[in-house]
Structures are given as C-alpha cells and as structure tokens.
Amino acid sequence: MLTKTALAVILFVFCLAPVAVTSGQSRAPITGEWRIEFNKKNADEVQLSMSRGQKQSWSNNIKISEIQGLSANYANAAAEVTLRIVHDAGTFDLVGSFRDGKGAGKFRLTPNEGFFSALAARGYSNLSEDQIFGAAMSDLKISAIDELKAAGYDQLTFNNLMESAIFKINAASIADLRSVGFDHLPFNKLVEGSIFKVDSNYVRETESLGFTKLPFEKLVEMRVHKITPEYINQVRQMGFNDLNLDRLVELKIFNVTPEFLNEMRAAGFTSITPKQLVNLRIFKIDGDYVRKAKSEDPNITVEKLVEQKIFEKHPGRGIQ
C-alpha cells in the first residue's frame, strides 16, 4: 500500500480520454516512463514517479518492499534493473537502470480484467485508459469500495474513489471521526480531514484545551494554520489565556511569537493586546522602530504608531 504524503507531494493529473474502453473489450497494456529516487531521510522508501507523456503524471513515496526486484543497494550502485509492482487493478513491469541513487526507464501496465469486471458490477464501467491507469496507480481496492458503501458512501464518482485510495479514506478513518461526533460527513470533508490530519486524537486534544464542539471546518482551519496544542499552550504562556480561535489563527498567520512580544515589551509597550501585536506585525514595526518613536514621543500609542507608519509609506494618506 502506498504511503500517504502531503498534498503537495502527490501529483495526480486526470486528462480523461474521449474514447473509453467498454466492459466487453480486453484492456490493452498501458505504457509510459518511470523514475525512482532513493529517500535520504527514510532508507525504507523511494520517491516513485510515473508519467504518460503530457497526459498523466503521478508521484509519491513508496516502500522499497512494495517494488519487487528493488534493492537498497541501488542507492549506491549502477545497475540494469527489471522491477515489478503488483496492485489489485494491474501489474506494472518496469525496465531501466540506476546510477547515483536515481533510476529511470519504461513501464508497462497490464490491467487486471477481474478487477475491472468487479468494478463494472458496482457501476463503474466504460472507463478510459487514464482512469484504468489511475486505479492501478492509486492501488484502488474493491474491498475498500465496498467498505465505503457500507459506511453510507454509495454515490461516489470514480474520481472520489481515486481520492479515497490516495488519501486512505476507509471504514476505519470514517469510524474514527464518528467516534468524536462527526457522523456522515460529506465526502469532500473526509478528504480535507485526511489531508490535514484531522482525526479523533486531534479533536480530543483541542477539546482538552477548551475548544469544544468546533465545526469540522474550524478543525481543518486549525490544522491548515498549524494551530497545535503546543502552540495554544505557547500563546497562553504569553499571558493570553482567553483567545478565541480566530484570534489564535491571526497570531499564527502573522508570526506573533513570545520573542516578538518580549521585543515589544522591552521597547516600551508593557501592556499590549493580541490585536495590537498583530497590527504591529502587519505593518512590519519592530523594536527599533518603537524605541525611535518613543524617544520622540514617550506616550505614543500602538494605534498612533501604526498611523505614523502608514503615513510614512503613503504620505498622501495623512491623518485628517
């Protein structure tokens, strides 16, 4: 099974062909080019990329053990290779060579007719060559489709099935979210949750910090902006104990850190609010700027300081 990576790592382009392979026809082999690069951070994985000219490309990390004939020795040796990847939807045969930890060559995908007959029986027939390739690359499984149907997701498009395979949306992940109150989320929300790792553990962690009964969209937003329990505790240690989620997100977006807070306090703003800190960050006001302004006007406020900065950048917008 392919390992899940961040969305930026997965490149999966569907350019659906106008001519589909009907369920009664034998599916011809599909060919293209492959590239493999050994992962310097994880010796058990490689970066596998497959492409079919300009039509489709796919890239992801995959365990070495999932590629028959691949050896970790190829990371440091030159060799001609014959490799194989067996998935439910078909078998990839790869030929090529390795040099300096990088491999490249040609592949040939032989579709599994039994798999596509079972897929057609579930309503997914007349698939294009690109969709056949997609099913094999994502390691789509009939058992996973049946699990989704049993969980109430029985009206999924073929592209939804691809997403379920890529982002590991299955009975277990659905049950995990249901255990914390998110019952029968729309499928696109399941995808978002999987991409940004919103699971029962994260929900319980946020609840333990006082953020209870948050809508699923807010939990995703927290993950997008990396609002972790550690970050929440960091903000509270800065003396801001009762901030709502929107204010936390603002602080994170504009990089309001304990160091920045201490810099502002040392420059003379000993009592400063989160909103004021955000405004200072927005207008790129640092400790040196504050000290210079306070040397000219010891009683200057944050608001006046921001107005002064705006006026310096846009003289025509002077304070009326």
Feature map (PLM): residue ranges:
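Bacterial N-terminal signal peptides that target proteins for export
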Residues: 1-8
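A general sequence property marking short-to-moderate contiguous segments
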Residues: 2, 20-21
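Bacterial N-terminal signal peptides
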Residues: 8-18
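General marker for long, soluble alpha-helical cores
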Residues: 21-320
